[in-house]
């Protein structure tokens, strides 16, 4: 019996070795290389973000007349604050002169809280706030580095400043007695910025832009509180706004995988 067991064990060991020798050798394959993407600015996008802004306002006090007569020298005041923004646009990227250029059009809307205490006339003080702005325009730029667009922008813009209630600067403080209405100013803007493709999520871009806006002067008629009766005086106001904005944008046609050439 012992001899039979030993014989069977030896036979099993020999058979296993023979079968293993007949099997193909195990092959090892490398993990697939990560896919590289070539970002493209051709297509449309949406985005949102925020920023910080400053505004300067030139105010001149007039007697309405006739004839209309300037009462005071022009004074300059200003405010500052934060804002949120949303944007949508479309771009087109094309090769030229050994690099790539981008042209596009866009529109954006800012939810603002840029405010300051102002004294546009002698003896009166109140708080003024730029509460919103919108812009439509275009941009042109070049792909300075792979995935990096440097651009300039410009176009038309409007900004809304809320109603200002003016009270006496004398002590003790008195309730407001006059005001000038909410006003929308019209103007133009110029800007410059960079936009960078975030490779960890294809289609997602990050951009930062400085923008300067100048608005046409507008006449604000002073009115009494509470009746709103127009007074015989008014204020001409002209505004200049500086903003720095940073946004995340998603491009729907963001590019595709880089295909190796042999």
PLM features per residue range, with description:
Residues 2-262:
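Gram-negative outer-membrane beta-barrel domains
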């Amino acid at each position: 019996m012992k001899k039979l067991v030993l014989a069977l064990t030896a036979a099993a060991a020999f058979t296993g070795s023979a079968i293993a020798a007949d099997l193909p050798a195990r092959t090892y394959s490398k993990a697939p290389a990560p896919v590289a993407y070539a970002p493209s600015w051709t297509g449309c996008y949406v985005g949102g973000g925020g920023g910080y802004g400053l505004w300067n306002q030139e105010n001149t006090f007039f007697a309405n007349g006739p004839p209309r007569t300037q009462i005071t020298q022009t004074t300059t005041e200003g405010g500052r604050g934060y804002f949120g923004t949303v944007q949508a646009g479309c771009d087109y990227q094309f090769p030229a002169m050994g690099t790539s250029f981008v042209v596009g059009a866009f529109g954006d809307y800012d939810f603002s809280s840029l405010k300051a205490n102002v004294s546009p006339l002698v003896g009166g003080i109140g708080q003024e706030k730029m509460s919103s702005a919108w812009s439509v325009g275009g941009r042109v730029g070049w792909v300075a580095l792979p995935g990096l667009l440097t651009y300039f922008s410009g176009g038309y813009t409007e900004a809304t400043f809320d109603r200002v209630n003016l009270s006496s600067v004398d002590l003790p403080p008195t309730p407001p007695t006059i005001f000038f209405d909410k006003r929308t100013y019209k103007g133009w803007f110029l800007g410059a910025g960079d936009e960078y493709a975030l490779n960890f999520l294809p289609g997602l871009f990050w951009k930062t832009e400085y923008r300067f806006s100048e608005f046409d002067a507008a006449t604000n008629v002073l009115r009494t509180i509470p009746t709103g009766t127009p007074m015989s005086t008014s204020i001409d106001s002209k505004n200049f706004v500086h903003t720095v904005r940073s946004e995340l944008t998603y491009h729907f046609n963001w590019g595709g995988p880089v295909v190796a050439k042999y």
